[in-house]
Every structure is written in structure tokens, then in C-alpha cells.
């Protein structure tokens, strides 16, 4: 199982939110590229980036820090937030991003996801953010009547590289991930599923791994708070 350290970008800084609330922000580093370098130095093989302002604006806002991270770090990175058209997808991939994450547009324009996945094999992931099993969009500000599992199944034959499943009520709360719901989703589709939201300890990571069906896990606040030692966790996940 791959561990993805998360760098959430707001106003050019690396931050964490609680439950996706932009008013409940903690700034962890005002130099996101330096934060990324520290994660790479600890041994991570991927980075997970989110343009929080972009998720609300519907277009990239934190392009400068993302580009700085891409230049500073030799490991692949995936990015979500404000990526809602083919031109933006192409621009990011041409700048060296390994994978784009499409969230809101997966609900509102699923044909774009399919088109992008055909054009860029292995470089397009679908971000499914759910509250009580139902998908939320536009930076989690709008709730839909779409069930997370139904949305995931709708992309079964689209060729997407991964599904990133975030349980909104767990995100940033350090209360543990929704391992059961994530594993259930992973069993429902053949697409690799990455867990996000609530990872608060090494035991949480090991439980996700031991499910046997979850391909990756994203962790943010637990790494910044020191609840998880990144190098130690990476080593533990090898066994």
C-alpha cells in the first residue's frame, strides 16, 4: 500500500482544514516546496497535493506553489482542486504532474473524465468526497443525491487510474479513517482505491493495508502533528 503525504494549499501556504471548513485552517508551513522536500527526504514515493482555493474557485489558484513543488521534488505527484476542463488537465500534465484528480467534474461532466482517461492513460484519478455515503462537490460545499459507490461504479470501464475516496466527516479530525466504507467501495469496483480522511496513527494505516483491498492511503494532519512518523510508517508498510 502506497502512503501519500498530503500538502493542502491555501493562499500559497501548506495548511490543514477540519471537515473541509475553510474557516478552520491551521497553517503548517508557509513554504510548501520545503514541506514537500522534507516528505521526500523521509522516503515517500508519491505526493498528494490539493489546491483548496481552486476547489472553491473552479480553476487553479495555487499554481505557483504547485509548480515549485514539482520542480523541487523527484517523486510523482497527484493534484486535485479546480481541475474542471481538458485545457487545465493538459496544462498540469505538461508541467510534470503525474496524475490529475477530477472531483466535481466527475459528477457534473463524467464524459470529460472518460475523455481525459482515454487521452492520458494512468494519469487521471477520480476524487469521490462523501458525507454519510453521498457525494459532495465544489470543495465539499454542495451535497448531491449521488451515492459514492454508484459514482465509482459508473467509471468502471473508463480507464481511470484510481479512485480517491474521502470521508469528509473524518477529514482533519484525527478520529481514524472509515476503513469499512473505503474497503466496501474498493470491493465494489476493480479500480484501485486510495483512502483519505481521518488517518491518525500507524495502526490506522496498517488497518487500511490489512483490509487487503485498499491500494493507498493519504495522510496530512497526522504527519504534521507528529502522530505518525513518516519514515517509520513507510518502513512498516513494506512488511
UniProtKB/Swiss-Prot annotation:
Q: What class of enzyme is it?
A: isomerase
- GO terms, molecular function: 1-(5-phosphoribosyl)-5-[(5-phosphoribosylamino)methylideneamino]imidazole-4-carboxamide isomerase activity
Q: Which gene encodes it?
A: hisA
Q: Which HAMAP family match?
A: HisA (MF_01014)
Source organism superkingdom: Bacteria
List the source organism.
Roseobacter denitrificans (strain ATCC 33942 / OCh 114)
The active site consists of 8 (proton acceptor), 129 (proton donor)
Family named by the database record: Belongs to the HisA/HisF family.
The secretion signal range is: none
Q: Which GO terms describe its cellular component?
A: cytoplasm
Query: In which pathway is this protein known to take part?
Result: Amino-acid biosynthesis; L-histidine biosynthesis; L-histidine from 5-phospho-alpha-D-ribose 1-diphosphate: step 4/9
> Under what name is this protein listed?
1-(5-phosphoribosyl)-5-[(5-phosphoribosylamino)methylideneamino] imidazole-4-carboxamide isomerase
Q: InterPro entries per the record?
A: Aldolase_TIM, His_biosynth, HisA_bact_arch, Isoase_HisA-like, Isoase_HisA-like_bact, RibuloseP-bd_barrel
User: Is Cytoplasm set as a keyword in this record?
Assistant: yes
Q: Which CDD domains match?
A: HisA
